[in-house]
């Protein structure tokens, strides 16, 4: 779970609505947060200029290629992967304490990072929280051969998305679409395997 002193926790709606003073540009914000959204609903992304009525204004967005926060995570992991585990731990601790913890709280992952593997798992947890919904962590999980588990008791994933995979998921490899291979049959023999149906959804 996300530390209660980590401001990123408020990117999702807490089941205990009284734990945080949620603010919204909506005129019905009090009712909206109390009754209009499910627990853990994502509220990380907000409409531009607070305009949720006019999509031409509220839908405007910047598409950044790389956030500076990503560089901090890359440096911490690279330092540890390069043989300096204490140095990687120090870098992650400094970033989290200086930029993510609130009210003077200190983040320290030393106890969770006795090995390189345990440190990378902790770093990836923080990175997944940081970049939720931004579409970059899949590449790290693929590179690190990490497993994913979407099917379990209490999951809120839709039924067809409850896929449990040990190691790299087959659907993380891009498959050239059928329309393209029909128009250019030579590339059909160079395509990645179609992952459809390879992983059965968890049924409980």
Question: Which ranges hold each PLM region?
Answer:
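Acidic/polar-rich alpha-helix caps and helix-coil junctions
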Residues: 2-204
């Amino acid at each position: 779970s996300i530390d209660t002193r980590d401001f990123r926790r408020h990117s999702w709606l807490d089941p205990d609505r009284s734990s945080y003073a949620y603010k919204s540009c909506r005129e019905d914000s009090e009712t909206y947060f109390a009754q209009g959204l499910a627990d853990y609903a994502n509220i990380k992304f907000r409409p531009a200029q607070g305009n949720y009525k006019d999509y031409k204004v509220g839908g405007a967005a910047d598409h950044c290629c790389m956030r500076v926060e990503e560089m901090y995570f890359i440096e911490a992991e690279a330092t540890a992967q390069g043989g300096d585990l204490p140095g990687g731990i120090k870098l992650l601790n400094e970033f989290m304490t200086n930029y993510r913890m609130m009210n003077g709280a200190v983040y320290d992952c030393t106890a969770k990072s006795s090995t390189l593997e345990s440190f990378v798992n902790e770093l990836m947890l923080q990175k997944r929280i940081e970049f939720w919904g931004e579409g970059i962590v899949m590449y790290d999980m693929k590179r690190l051969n990490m497993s994913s588990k979407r099917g379990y008791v209490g999951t809120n994933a839709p039924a067809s998305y409850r896929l449990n995979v040990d190691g790299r998921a087959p659907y993380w490899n891009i498959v050239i679409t059928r329309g393209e291979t029909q128009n250019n049959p030579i590339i059909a023999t160079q395509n990645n395997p179609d992952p459809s149906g390879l992983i059965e959804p968890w049924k409980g």
